[in-house]
């Protein structure tokens, strides 16, 4: 059975690059969202057992998504993928429930290592 994956970023190019970085043998069903509101809707529709989440987006940013997931007690493995590498941002997302923080641009090796670390693949 395919694992539902949600890639959330306001940049279509960034979403495409991240999707290309996913392990080719990984049995997944990939959905995409361009902002935080779309991400929450996709999550509620069952499309996000694992979510790759950008922080800086219009409408609702990644912090807002994490807060909404926490308030609604929704469980998803959230991996934040962001160019914002400030330690404060990293600490904040981890405190809000993210399982990992990956710096953009992503690499296939780094994504695989994070997924293996958390037993996703």
Locations of regions flagged by a protein language model:
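Two-component/phosphorelay signaling modules centered on CheY-like receiver
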Residues: 12-31, 96
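Acidic catalytic/metal-coordinating carboxylates
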Residues: 35-38, 61-64
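Active-site beta3 strand of CheY-like receiver
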Residues: 46-52
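Receiver (REC) domain active-site loop signature in two-component systems and cognate sites
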Residues: 57
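Alpha4 helix (beta4-alpha4-beta5 surface) of REC/receiver domains from two-component response regulators
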Residues: 85-100, 113
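C-terminal output helix
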Residues: 106-115
